[in-house]
């Protein structure tokens, strides 16, 4: 019985799951929005939110903890240089999940997961000149 076992298995072994969420966390930190399946997005929240909370206080120990969890130097740099200061006044809830329909091949529910205070992307073109 799997009573009181938290987290989703996602039909993967533990090392595959750990590597997948490590890669997805790095992608989310670098791009600030990614598209994935809904269960993966919900589980990714549990990985990324503590990393951003860790980045709010910049110290060598916290940087080493973040590197141990992501294994990516660029991700750690962006976490502590950009995201930590950006979310300094926010007490949790750094991500948002937006459902976006179903995948064509297998009808899996898809979702965007994004950082909430993401800078607005300019949609203006060069035709305004």
Curated annotation (Swiss-Prot):
Looking up InterPro entries in the UniProt record yields: Ribosomal_bL17, Ribosomal_bL17_CS, Ribosomal_bL17_sf
Q: Which domain of life is it from?
A: Bacteria
Organism of origin: Actinobacillus succinogenes (strain ATCC 55618 / DSM 22257 / CCUG 43843 / 130Z)
What Pfam families has UniProt attached to this entry?
Answer: Ribosomal_L17
Q: Which UniProt keywords apply?
A: Ribonucleoprotein, Ribosomal protein
Q: Into which family does the record put it?
A: Belongs to the bacterial ribosomal protein bL17 family.
Q: Offer a single GO CC term for the protein.
A: cytosolic large ribosomal subunit
Q: Name one GO molecular function term.
A: structural constituent of ribosome
GO terms classed as biological process: translation
Extract the PROSITE patterns matched here: RIBOSOMAL_L17 (PS01167)
Cross-referenced Gene3D superfamilies: Ribosomal protein L17 (3.90.1030.10)
What is the protein named?
Answer: Large ribosomal subunit protein bL17
The record describes its quaternary structure and partners as:
Part of the 50S ribosomal subunit. Contacts protein L32.
């Amino acid at each position: 019985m799997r009573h009181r076992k938290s987290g989703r298995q996602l039909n993967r072994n533990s090392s595959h799951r750990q590597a997948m969420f490590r890669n997805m966390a790095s992608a989310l930190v670098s791009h600030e929005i990614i598209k994935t399946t809904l269960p993966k997005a919900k589980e990714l929240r549990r990985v990324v939110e503590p990393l951003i909370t860790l980045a709010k206080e910049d110290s060598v120990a916290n940087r080493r903890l973040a590197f141990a969890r992501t294994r990516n130097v660029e991700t750690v740099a962006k976490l502590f240089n950009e995201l930590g200061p950006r979310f300094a006044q926010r007490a949790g809830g750094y991500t948002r999940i937006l459902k976006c329909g179903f995948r064509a091949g297998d009808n899996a529910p898809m979702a965007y997961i994004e950082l909430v205070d993401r800078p607005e992307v300019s949609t203006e073109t060069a035709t305004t000149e």
